[in-house]
């Protein structure tokens, strides 16, 4: 989790955690 919303690099679940 780099704190950046990257759906192309991270799965949807991971991006959701970062986005929220």
UniProtKB/Swiss-Prot annotation:
List the residue ranges of the region (Disordered). 1-20
Compositional bias ranges of the Basic and acidic residues kind? 9-20
- What domain of life? Eukaryota
Could you give one GO CC term from the UniProt record? chloroplast thylakoid lumen
Q: Where in the cell is it found?
A: Plastid, Chloroplast thylakoid lumen
Record key words, sorted: Chloroplast, Plastid, Thylakoid
| Major localization class | plastid
- For the keyword Plastid, the answer is yes
Name of protein: Thylakoid lumenal 14.7 kDa protein
Source species of the chain: Spinacia oleracea
Q: What is the lineage of its organism?
A: Eukaryota, Viridiplantae, Streptophyta, Embryophyta, Tracheophyta
């Amino acid at each position: 989790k780099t704190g950046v919303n990257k759906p192309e690099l991270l799965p949807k679940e991971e991006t959701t955690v970062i986005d929220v």
